[in-house]
């Protein structure tokens, strides 16, 4: 007969030279069709062999919520699941102008939020969290009616789940077009966002979001107007210094969550008044799209949330804006934890995942496989 329960406080096995055989089974909970009992308050202290990972695990509430944790050979048995994050939204697209129009504003960078230098998240194992990685604002192609069109905003990036405050980085604002009002206008003014879009008409750029980005710049004061740069996470977009020079995009910010300092969220450059003459504004930190005196603006760098740069129309051809760069979510946590499982990716195939290490930490990077907003569920 098998021994199923011991009623004494101590079991003396000191004379036994063999081993204690414990329960074993795969690492999937019975509630999901596996063999592992759900860890809850009634079985705290239970141990078993996880045959999926070939490790011994214990049901514990050391992290605050009952969960299975692996036993380690050395060091502390339980390492808290403390997660640093970098969340960047998609950058805004630049504006565009019709033939014989003036310059257009650069797109604002996507909002940037990070725990580096601040407070990391405390997450729980066997718990699902949702992520959304935002696409960049689509470029405005050379439309003829109406003659002036502002750029599209980038899409938000977000991390959410039970027990934490949702973290939402706001998409970058679209750049304004080469006119400010009238029947020829379609969303001509720049848009607010994580960082604000630059303006292509007399006046100020759009506002950025406090704690995430900065404002777009100011356009040249007289007609025909050169346009300003979109705001970046590190600084506001620059104003157009004169009618033949577009304003530079705002600077991005450097972040070392991966172990390597990398720039994110630069603003897009504005375009000059006239095609073929003058100079477009530079994209912020060389990751925002450059403005140009040519017809087609340059795109913001993908996976950085940077704004698109603007182009300049000729007397007979419409300009085309640059697209904003897609956003990114990066998570950093102790290497003793495996990469979270991924599910519910929408659209299917839309998420690119990179699993790397930096010393004692694992670094997970999530980006759009194409410039399309993608969502998914992570389970640690």
Segments (PLM) and residue ranges:
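The right-handed parallel beta-helix/beta-solenoid scaffold, focusing on the short coil/turn
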Residues: 2, 9-11, 18, 66, ...
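Tryptophan-centered short beta-strand motifs
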Residues: 3, 63-72
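Extracellular/surface-exposed low-complexity repeats and stalk/linker segments enriched in Gly/Pro
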Residues: 4-53, 72
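Low-complexity, glycine/proline-biased repetitive segments and flexible coils/loops
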Residues: 29, 63-64, 82-380
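Short beta-strand segments and strand-loop junctions that repeat across beta-rich extracellular domains
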Residues: 53-66
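Extracellular/luminal ectodomains of metazoan preproproteins built from arrays
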Residues: 72-75, 341-343
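Short "repeat-start/strand-capping" segments in structured domains, especially the N-termini
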Residues: 73-75, 80-84
